[in-house]
């Protein structure tokens, strides 16, 4: 997935969930949009180097968006969780998700379920069970362990219930955890953050719902991040 043209700055603070103040290399201060509703643990600290993009939209109050954080150890994390579905869509098209590579038809944002939900992707293929795929981001990393979620997610809990219902109706149901951080090679659910999500997903997996985690990798050109892709599945610790 190609990233938009990026410029760097220093994070001053994030506030009101969707806003951040940054200091430009010129010393000027600018407010930008933050498309992340999570806690952003470890990837949104004062003084962090961040990368932001610009939009030409005339309707946006804040035309710049926080895209990436570059950590002190050099690792990168895409904090714009809107990118996760773009990333997975490209990976599905390119048959990079081996567990789903047999599907040829990809339908994004399809209404389904009894709780008024939209599935991120509905996959279809001749002679195959329909496959409902819910995408979740991995931005929380400790050591080399990626975790999700980074905040309590009642929406995520609802999605697990909906997926289990689809499985019981005879379809495939998958939670795909997409790496937006390039510093992990193992994955587990952050049960200490959202024990209910952990419980629901474990119970769903016992009844046939599938869950996979994929690592992310950034491409760098002239010291500027230019692309992000999913590389390979990582060990899923249950």
Swiss-Prot record:
This is Sugar fermentation stimulation protein homolog. Belongs to the SfsA family. It comes from Haemophilus influenzae (strain ATCC 51907 / DSM 11121 / KW20 / Rd). One of its GO terms (molecular function) is DNA binding. InterPro entries: SfsA (IPR005224), SfsA_C (IPR040452), SfsA_N (IPR041465).
């Amino acid at each position: 997935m190609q990233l938009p043209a990026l410029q760097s700055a220093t994070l001053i603070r994030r506030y009101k969930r969707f806003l951040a103040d940054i200091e430009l290399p010129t010393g000027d201060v600018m407010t930008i949009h933050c498309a992340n509703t999570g806690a952003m643990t470890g990837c949104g600290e004062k003084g962090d180097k961040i990368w932001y993009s610009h939009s030409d939209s005339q309707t946006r109050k804040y035309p710049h968006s926080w895209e990436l954080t570059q950590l002190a150890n050099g690792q990168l994390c895409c904090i714009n969780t809107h990118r996760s579905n773009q990333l997975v869509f490209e990976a599905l098209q390119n048959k990079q998700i081996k567990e789903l590579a047999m599907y040829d038809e990809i339908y994004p944002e399809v209404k389904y379920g009894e709780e008024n939900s939209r599935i991120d992707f509905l996959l279809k293929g001749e002679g195959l069970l329909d496959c409902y795929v819910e995408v979740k981001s991995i931005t929380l990393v400790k050591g080399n362990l990626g975790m999700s979620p980074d905040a309590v997610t009642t929406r995520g809990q609802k999605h697990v219930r909906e997926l289990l219902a689809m499985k019981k109706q005879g379809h495939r149901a998958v939670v795909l955890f997409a790496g937006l951080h390039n510093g992990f090679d193992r994955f587990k659910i952050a049960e200490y953050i959202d024990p209910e999500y952990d419980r629901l997903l474990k119970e769903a997996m016992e009844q046939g719902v599938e869950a996979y985690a994929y690592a992310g990798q950034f491409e760098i050109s002239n010291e500027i991040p230019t692309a992000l892709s999913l590389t390979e599945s990582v060990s899923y610790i249950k």
